[in-house]
Amino acid sequence: MKFSSLIGHSGELLQLVRSSEKPADSVIDLFFRSHKYLGSHDRRFIAESTYGTLRHLRKCESLLKRALGDHALDMIPEDGFLLLVVTYLIGIEQRTAFEVTDLQPAVKSGKLKPHIGSILQSLSRPQDLEPTELVERIGEEYSYPDWMVRRFLDQYGEKDTVLLCESLNSQAPLSLRVNSLKSSVEECQQALRKEGIATERTKLSPF
């Protein structure tokens, strides 16, 4: 599937999740059931992009707001969710190899299309978040509500609050056990590598 289509599907799914009262995993499962033409690689990209954007939503919203500037007035809701996914991929995942042609076909607003290049350039430049107040700065950096950050600071102090927020908002690793009667660790790693999945041996149980 073309990259523009993957981005478009990711933006569509993010909008569905944000507008639904159901848990995100239920909405995503229903989305894939109704889009059976999506291959395994497409599904993985769309799911990871959606979950990642949700995990870093507050930071992505802040970065996108500054990148858009006055062009925010030209944006319709569908394009907003689309650009949030793009912001996550560029600002969080550091995927800077975006071309205007990757994004323009998925953008629906005719007024916004001519400015996609400048928006991508702005997102690709290193940006410091604006808030100078400690609670807001930590909240935006790690996408936590201010009230929760304030409570963490009261209990743990600044250093441990930053470590806690960073840890809790990181994607959890997945551990797999290999049945050595049927396969070896190397064979499993090779099979996963062919699917584009990077693995490493665990430190506590390497065999």
Features from the language model and the residues they span:
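Class I Rossmann-like S-adenosyl-L-methionine
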Residues: 1-207
